[in-house]
């Protein structure tokens, strides 16, 4: 997949996403917040792409897809599941410094977020299963991304951004407490 195709796919998928819970329900507010993040990052990705900022367009798309997929998993959103989408092509060499910086920043952010968050629900509740899935997804993203470095900064950025989107969605959904 090329960056332009990824951004286009994300925009189309985000545009079709709808709440899976009644708007007036107690869960409706969280569904709206998730969809707002998904929509905002789809818009940001399009603006970045329009201005030739491929690195930020890519990161915004993957991060937003993480939010979207987590929102679907949690049952707040009805949408197509994307999983993390890899690029088949490297970025232009003149963007490597920016790509490297962004990739390493997302790696640090994901590590920090994992270290600085704890499950909010009691381990005996059904919600705890969701916590485990979200943490597992974020930890797997960190591990896979680190294994890709330093050979594949592009797809390492994809998995770091995507995993960070999952974890952020879990935090916003009240499933994690921030400890540090």
Place the predicted regions along the sequence by residue.
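Long, charged/polar, soluble alpha-helical segments
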Residues: 1-180
